[in-house]
Structure formats: structure tokens, C-alpha cells
From Swiss-Prot:
Name of this chain's protein: Protein DETOXIFICATION 49
Organism annotation: Arabidopsis thaliana
Family per record: Belongs to the multi antimicrobial extrusion (MATE) (TC 2.A.66.1) family.
Topology relative to the membrane: Multi-pass membrane protein
Compartment(s): Membrane
Record CDD domains: MATE_eukaryotic
One Pfam family recorded for the sequence: MatE
Membrane-crossing segments per the record: 41-61, 75-95, 123-143, 153-173, 190-210, 216-236, 267-287, 293-313, 338-358, 372-392, 414-434, 439-459
Keyword Membrane: yes
Gene: DTX49
Cystine residue pairs: none
């Protein structure tokens, strides 16, 4: 009887026991790399497709041959990104740790609840954003913008208002699918939506002559198509059956858990988005503002293109880490995090080589103005260095999201970008003679310090504690944050994100 008894005790105490006996670390890492690649490759294609959609819209905007319309549309897009899209994108990320950990824990109905809660949250947030957008002209005029450009910006953003509703559904649905490692349907849906985007814009802008209104309506129409394709997939594939318990009044509970994750996630996203907007404003104060602002626009588009790759990897790592924590597998979560970091280092090297290879020809894809070409060529190698830090730190942000520690990530971003990077950028650009180059050296300082901070966090993470926190998150999310008087409130424990060991 002793042997069976020992076996029972071992099975009950070793919660990390895996059905596959003692795989080597190398084989586990290789298998994990395959799992990450399976999720991230379709996401990269999806990102490239959606990037091309934005470029198509800008091309039709440029073909209007109306400088005030082009300026107004560009200004409206920047305003929409800062005051609307960044907020909705950031808030939606709050559901990611809940969904990935719930899927790993096989508590599938919680995914449907998180989807309902987050969609409702974004719809509610769209109301004050809409009020702000309705007053865009007054706001722009208050800050000294040209009246004609403000009029055009108002036209564009008023016709973009329905997009807030569409984004309130699109963001949660994407996360809902990604959390289950379902990414190919996202790619197919984006492909067909972008394929239709060209004739839609041609019809609205060129054939019907709607001009700036047509560009805005074309973007909305494409998002309607994208949302429709995703809903069709969810319904006909049956993927919703094990995760959807129908519309439930429980979606009005559990908001404290969601908000404690959503608000730091939103802050983290906005801090990065707003950094580039501040950089553009600083360009206007440099020695040659017209050339530097134009070059900054090209370089921001370039970094947005490169960012698709580490961002997709970050989402994949977040999914894998969260799934394993939810499945009570701390060792596998650790392997997922370290494997993702290794892949991101290789990705950073590739991004640096790309920036170096195209530095002398990239700007000519956008302009023939020699001063702009010269500035862009000068800064691209610095961007390559930035990507050495950006790719790993973006991936490690995914580790923090998957382990439900967005507050820690937001604090790191705040300190590194605004207390390190911004002062360095201002000092080098305006007081040390580096001018335009100094702004990007400031970004390099921010990315480098951010990477070091993230590496320290990863090295000190206690994965056993993270498994415990994952269980608590699942309990609170299911029970609607009701305090039973014995278990410490989830959000207090989530605030203690220093659950790290040396």
C-alpha cells in the first residue's frame, strides 16, 4: 500500500506535473517557439494588411489635390488617435489577461463575460469621446489652428463618429479570438476587408465626389466589413459555443477587476502613442521646422511599420504566458516568457539591419526633397538601434499583460519615456546642438532604460506567485468581485505587483 499512497501524495502536491515526462529545456523551448510562431505569423500579416489600409486612405486623401483637406484630414486623424482610438485600444487590453488565463484554466464562459463587459465599457467611453469630437473645431481654434484647416478637420472627424462604435466591438472581438490562439480568421477577414477598401474609396471619393467625407466614410465601411467577416466566422465556425453563455446580467458585475487591468493598460498605450505626437510638436521648434516635421512624419510611418512585428510577437507571448498561468503551469509560463525574449532579440537585430540597409533610399519613396531625404537618412541608423531595445521591451510588455501586471508596465513606460527619454531628447536637441537627431537619441535612451527595467522584472518574477494570482483573478472575475471577507480583494493583491524574487 505504501507505493500507491506515495504516488497519490506526489500527484496531489506536485501541481506542475506534466503528462510529458521530463522534456529537455531545449526541446521545450523549440516547441514553445513553434506555438508562439503559430500565433504571431498570422498577426503580422493582419497588421501589414491594416497598415496598407491606412496607406490607401492617405493616398486617396492626397489625390484630392486640396491642401486644406489634406492638412485637415491629417490633423483630424492625429486628434482622433490621441483622444479616441488610443483610449479604446488601451482599455480593451484590460480584458486580455482575463481571457488568456481563463482559456488556460478552461473556464471558457469567462471569455464570453469578459467580451460583454469590455464591449460595454468601450461603448460607454465612446460617449464622452464623441462629445469631445463634436467640439473639435472650437478646440483647434482655441489652440491657434487655421480656420479653414479646422473646418476640414471637423468635417472628417464628424463623419468618423460611427467608427467609435465599430472599434468598441472590433477590439474586444480580436482579443477574444487571439486569447484562444485563433488568429488566421483575423488575417482572412482583414485581407477581404482591405481588398474591398480600394473600390469603396474609389466609389465614394472619385465616383461620387464626396472628397474628405468619402475618405472618412470609406474607413467606416471597411470596418463594417471587417466586423461582419469576424462575426460570420464566429457564428459559422461554432467557436462561440463553449465560451458564450448568452447575454447575461453578470456582465454588469466584475467591473472592478476589469477596470484595475484596463486603466493601467490604457495609460501604458497612451504614453507611447502620445510620445510621438509630442515629438512632432518639438520638431516645430527646431532650426528647420518644415523639413524636420516632414521627416518626422516619414520616420513615424516607418516605425509604425516595423512595430507590427514586435507587437505581434508581444501578443503571442502574452497569450502563451497567460494560458500557461491559467493552466497552473508556472514552469511553462517561464519558458514561454524566455523563449519570447530570445525571439525578440533576433527580431531586434533584423529590424536594425533593415534600417541600416534602406537608410539611403527609404525617404525617396515618399519625397524627392533633398533636405528631408538627408534628415531621414541620418536618423534611420538611430531607429535601428532603438529597435534593439524596442523589440525585446515590447515583448516583455506582453509578458506583463499575460501575467496581469499592466500597472507595472505603465509605471515603467512613464518613468522611462517621460522621466528619462524626454529630458534627454530636449537636452540633446535644444541645448547640445544635436537638433533633429537629439529627439531620436532621446527615444533610444527611453527604449534602453525600458528594456533594462523589463529585464529586471522578468529575472525577479516568481512564477509560482503569478499562478496564485491567476487563480485569484479567475475567482474574482467569475464571482463579480464580491468580497467574501476572507480572501483579500483581488485588486489590492493585483496592485502589489512587486511579487518578485531575486
Amino acid at each position: 500500500m505504501a507505493a500507491p499512497l506515495l504516488m497519490i501524495i506526489k500527484n496531489q502536491t506536485d501541481h506542475r506535473q506534466d503528462p510529458n515526462p521530463n522534456p529537455t529545456h531545449l526541446s521545450s523551448s523549440i516547441q514553445e517557439a513553434k506555438s508562439i510562431a503559430k500565433i504571431s505569423l498570422p498577426l503580422i500579416l493582419t497588421g501589414l494588411l491594416l497598415y496598407s489600409r491606412s496607406m490607401i486612405s492617405m493616398l486617396f486623401l492626397g489625390r484630392l489635390n486640396d491642401l486644406s483637406a489634406l492638412s485637415g484630414g491629417s490633423l483630424a486623424l492625429g486628434f482622433a488617435n490621441i483622444t479616441g482610438y488610443s483610449l479604446l485600444s488601451g482599455l480593451s487590453i484590460g480584458m486580455e489577461p482575463i481571457c488568456v488565463q481563463a482559456f488556460g484554466a478552461k473556464r471558457f464562459k469567462l471569455l464570453g463575460l469578459a467580451l460583454q463587459r469590455t464591449t460595454l465599457l468601450l461603448l460607454l467611453c465612446s460617449l464622452p469621446i464623441s462629445i469631445l469630437w463634436l467640439n473639435i473645431k472650437k478646440i483647434l481654434l482655441f489652440f491657434g489652428q487655421d480656420e479653414e484647416i479646422s473646418n476640414q478637420a471637423e468635417i472628417f472627424i464628424l463623419f468618423s463618429l460611427p467608427d467609435l462604435i465599430l472599434q468598441s466591438f472590433l477590439h474586444p472581438i480580436r482579443i477574444y479570438l487571439r486569447s484562444q490562439s485563433i488568429t488566421l480568421p483575423l488575417t482572412y477577414s482583414a485581407f477581404f476587408a482591405v481588398l474591398l477598401h480600394i473600390p469603396i474609396n474609389y466609389l465614394l471619393v472619385s465616383s461620387l465626389g464626396l472628397g474628405l467625407k468619402g475618405v472618412a466614410l470609406g474607413a467606416i465601411w471597411t470596418n463594417v466589413n471587417l466586423l461582419g467577416f469576424l462575426i460570420i466566422y464566429i457564428v459559422f465556425s461554432g467557436v462561440y459555443q463553449k465560451t458564450w453563455g448568452g447575454f447575461s446580467m453578470d456582465c454588469f458585475k466584475g467591473w472592478r477587476s476589469l477596470m484595475k487591468l484596463a486603466i493601467p493598460s490604457c495609460v501604458s498605450v497612451c504614453l507611447e502613442w502620445w510620445w510621438y505626437e509630442i515629438m512632432i510638436l518639438l520638431c516645430g521648434l527646431l532650426l528647420n521646422p518644415q523639413a524636420t516635421v516632414a521627416s518626422m512624419g516619414i520616420l513615424i510611418q516607418t516605425t509604425a511599420l516595423i512595430y507590427i512585428f514586435p507587437s505581434s510577437l508581444s501578443i503571442s507571448v502574452s497569450t502563451r504566458v497567460g494560458n500557461e498561468l491559467g493552466a497552473n503551469q508556472p514552469d511553462k509560463a517561464r519558458i514561454a516568457a524566455r523563449t519570447g525574449l530570445s525571439l525578440s532579440l533576433g527580431l531586434g537585430l533584423l529590424a536594425m539591419f533593415f534600417a541600416l540597409m534602406v537608410r539611403n533610399c527609404w525617404a525617396r519613396l515618399f519625397t524627392d526633397e533633398e533636405e528631408i531625404v538627408k534628415l531621414t537618412s541620418m536618423v534611420l541608423p538611430i531607429i535601428g538601434l532603438c529597435e534593439l531595445g524596442n523589440c525585446p521591451q515590447t515583448t516583455l510588455c506582453g509578458v506583463l499583460r499575460g501575467s496581469a501586471r499592466p500597472k507595472l508596465g505603465a509605471n515603467i513606460n512613464l518613468c522611462c519615456f517621460y522621466f528619462v527619454g524626454m529630458p534627454v531628447a530636449v537636452w540633446l536637441s535644444f541645448f547640445s546642438g544635436f537638433d533633429f537627431k537629439g529627439l531620436w537619441l532621446g527615444l533610444f535612451a527611453a527604449q534602453g532604460s525600458c528594456l533594462i527595467s523589463m529585464l529586471v522584472v522578468l529575472a525577479r518574477t516568481d512564477w509560482e506567485v503569478e499562478v496564485h494570482r491567476a487563480k485569484e483573478l479567475m475567482t474574482r472575475s467569475c464571482d463579480g468581485d464580491e468580497d467574501d471577507g476572507n480572501t483579500p480583494f483581488l485588486l489590492d493583491s493585483l496592485d502589489i505587483e512587486e511579487n518578485l524574487v531575486f
